[in-house]
Amino acid sequence: DSQYNPLEMSLLVDALHEGVDAVNGYKLTRNDSLFRTIIGRAYHNFVKIFFNIHIRDVDCDFRLIPRRILDEIELQSVSGAICLELVKKIEDAGYRFAEVPVNHYSRKYGVSQFLVPWRVLRTLRQLAVLYWKLVIRKEHKRKLS
């Protein structure tokens, strides 16, 4: 959908150094509709409070995560909640993120699936399941021990 500039990947590579295990981008300016921007901010606040996420933009899809980390993380989500699950499990495994500002562009291709009603319901359901598994039961931490 061309919402990120692939040339900015070099910024993430430069941020990956000793003491940093993975790099997550964060949108300098979100180029979405006002409604989508408001929903996005509410979502970020929600995940920071309820999931204790430490990065500022959990749904920025511009990341650099070494394969060795991905091999340790078992993902189960099949909706937009997968970004939250990925970041939460990486943080809880003790890995450290660096954050890099990246440009975010208006979608050039395709149509956002974000507000399709059945997808929203599926994501809300998966958020509830993730909260139960990752915050209440801490199932993933038992597997890491």
Where are these regions (language model features)?
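Acceptor/aglycone-binding surface of glycosyltransferases and processive sugar-polymer synthases
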Residues: P6-G80, Y105-V129, K138-R142
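A short, conserved alpha-helix in the catalytic core of glycosyltransferases
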Residues: I69-I73, S79-R96
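The conserved acidic donor/metal-binding loop of glycosyltransferases
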Residues: D1-Q3
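Hydrophobic residues at beta-strand termini and immediately following loops
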Residues: V100
